[in-house]
Each structure stands twice: as structure tokens, then as C-alpha cells.
Amino acid sequence: QITVFEKTPVTNNAAAAPILAKWDKIFAHFEDFSGPISLYSNVDPDAKLRKAAEDCEIKINQFHTDIFQNPKLYNLIKNTQATDPIDQKYRQDILSQFEDTGVQLEPAKRARMKAILDELTKLEQEYARNVRDNPEKLEFTPEEMTGLPQSYISALKKNAKGNYLLGFEYPEYRPFMELADNDDARKRYQIAFTRRGTEQNLKLLKQAIDLRYELAQLFGKASYADWVLKDRMAKTPDAVNQFLAEVQKTVAPLER
């Protein structure tokens, strides 16, 4: 469909509506295909299927980048003229996505942009795996299990000391947090749950931060925040920092 769309004859200032309608239809099909794959990669109980879905995600993201780094497609949309306000907004959003993917960059920078996006996708997947597939178990004494139904307790494994071992799967975590009587045990479980994967993921975050900084440099921006905020309401990091300072000034006295 993209190949056919790329060959669409368009003159300067051509009506945007029919072109945008074709584009929207293509990406509706694209999302129908890619959406379930993303779901499988995150929630399917079969580890092999999750891995296969992750491999597909990488290829899908590479294909997506190829589309939005294609100058022919970019110029096709750019040569249209929209009169309807909704079409104007949609057209500009599409053009911005092309530009944010580096369609206007010189070839070497465009290739580096694609490599960065690929690496960020892989880091994101590894980060999610470290949270989702975390094998760590917490140890709870029989006394700390007070309040939980016997059917729940009977399904748990014990260690040599006779204490119960609980992981981070929701069928284990949620009942404990909702029903266990021991406040300290619930607090310990909650802290461990929110910190799962932290040791490995801090390293991944550092890599992602470095890649995002390099990405911003490709576009001549001082930081990733400068780059990502340019199309958002705040526009600049200074505006965000000023807003946060005002919020802190307002709420800080209320915490005392």
C-alpha cells in the first residue's frame, strides 16, 4: 500500500483531503497489524511467543522509520493544501512526524537517527523484560500471611525455613496487598514491587539518556528535552522548570 501511495500523482497545492484519507486508511491497517503484536510481547504467558513478538516489533519499528524517512512520501504530503481545520492539523501532524524522524537530515545523520531509534526500541524491550520477567522472590513468615485466604497460601512455595516465597506476578501481589493484615509486610512488598528490575534498568536508562542526547544533537538541539518539547504546549525546558517551581512553591507549605 505504501508503494502504491508513493506513486500517487500530486501537483503543488493539490487538495489534501483525498490524500490524507488514503494515508489514514494505510495507517489504520498498520495499527490493526502492529497493535496485537505489541500486546503479545508484553502479556502473553508463552516466553517464546513474547520473544517472537519482540523481534517483530523491531522490524515493524524499522519499517515505520523507513516510511517517515522517505523524502518522496514527505514531499507528497507537503505539496498538498488543506482548507478544513481538521485536515490542516492532521497534515501538520504527519509532516512533523516525518521531520521528527529525520527526513530532512543529510543521509549520514538520517542513517544515524535510524540506528538510534532501533537501539532505543531494543533498550525499551529489555527494560520491560527486566520488570515483567523479574525472577526475584520475597520471603514472608507465616505470621506475615495473616489475613490471606488459605486457598491463596496453599498455592505458594516455601523455603527451607518454612517461609513463603512471593514473586511479582499480579496473582500473587494483588491479593497480598489487599488482604494481608501486616502493614510492614505490605510496605516491604510494595517497595520491592515498585523497584523490581532497578539494578539492571538504571544502566539501560543511562544508555537511553545518552542516545536521546545524541538524537537531539542531530537536530541541533541542546538537549532531548529541547527537542521533544518543541511541538508541545510548554515549548521549552525553561517553561517546564518554571511551572514545576511554581507548583512546588504552592504545595510545599501544605506539606508541613
Pin down the residues of each PLM region.
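Zn2+-dependent metallopeptidase catalytic domains
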Residues: 1-256
